[in-house]
Amino acid sequence: MYEDVEGLQDQQCVIRQIQAQLYYGYEYMGATTRLVITPLTDKCWITISGALHIKLGANPAGPAGTGKTESTKDLAKGIAVLCIVYNCSDQVDYQMMQRHFAGLAQQGCWTCLDEFNRILVEVLSVIAQQLQEIRKALLMGVEEFVFQGKGIKIRPEFGCHITMNPGYAGRTELPDNLQILFRPVAMMIPSYELIA
């Protein structure tokens, strides 16, 4: 972590990882326990921070119990940004996601869309359009933009990440226009020797 004094009116704490520069969020999470850092966790964090640097999300994918959601949540906790986990199902519709994204973009929070590939493919197509609108606003560096026909504010700290478990039945393939919005990271069963 660094204190950034160049080019800013108010001094901010900056987290730098490889080329990514993320701002400390000052969101108090309480005195909670932290995740054990393994090479797998480190790889996931580097992918997430690299994705955020280019205004994309991350896509940790792998079997159950590999730490996909927990790694995302713990990085958010480490840089003091609120991360809302949203458990996806085939009941999710595009209007739910529109409200979810609008609220998070205005607050500068992260979301982790857990089991994202459970959502119906028709809904995923609309979600891709929604996320492309948000990414375009982030790339332009604007403070306000029109999201699905409604003007909203946006904070640059916003991040949307998804987790997928490709092995389960009833999962859909992500459309191409959605896949390009997320950097993939393969998660596997961690070495229990490192954790113990």
List the model feature ranges, each with a label:
Residues 55-57, 82-84, 107-111, 122, ...:
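Loop/turn-to-beta-strand initiation segments
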Residues 49, 92-115, 144-153:
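Conserved alpha-helical scaffold flanking the Walker A/P-loop in AAA+ ATPase domains
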Residues 101-102, 117-155, 159-168, 176, ...:
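Conserved catalytic/switch belt of AAA+ P-loop NTPases
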Residues 95-98, 171-196:
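Conserved AAA+ ATPase core "coupling" helix
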Residues 66, 90-93, 117-120, 160, ...:
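Conserved nucleotide-binding/hydrolysis micro-motifs of P-loop NTPases
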Residues 53-86, 100-103, 126-128, 133:
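Walker A/P-loop
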Residues 40-41, 49-55:
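Phosphate-binding P-loop
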Residues 1-39, 43:
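Extended, charged/polar low-complexity intrinsically disordered regions
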